[in-house]
């Protein structure tokens, strides 16, 4: 009985550790913790068709300002 409890405890710890490692609660990229910036970067990413535009917009202010220029002609 004690050995089966030990096995269950070890399995529980392994599952808990893996769950924390592969959690989907990632922190926002760069400055996209701000809702407004994240929303604008998503719109520009969709319009540009460039794969990494969203992350570039979130990290670099220059890309963010180009995004603003693209949205407000």
Swiss-Prot record:
UniProt keyword annotations, A-Z: Disulfide bond, Secreted, Signal, Toxin
GO cellular component: extracellular region
PTM description: Contains 3 disulfide bonds.
Domain of life: Eukaryota
Expressing tissues: Expressed by the venom gland.
Main localization, broad class: secreted
Signal sequence segment: 1-23
Subcellular localization: Secreted
This protein's record includes keyword Signal: yes
GO MF assignments: toxin activity
Protein family according to the UniProt entry: Belongs to the scoloptoxin-03 family.
Protein name listed in UniProt: U-scoloptoxin(03)-Ssd1b
Organism name: Scolopendra dehaani (Thai centipede)
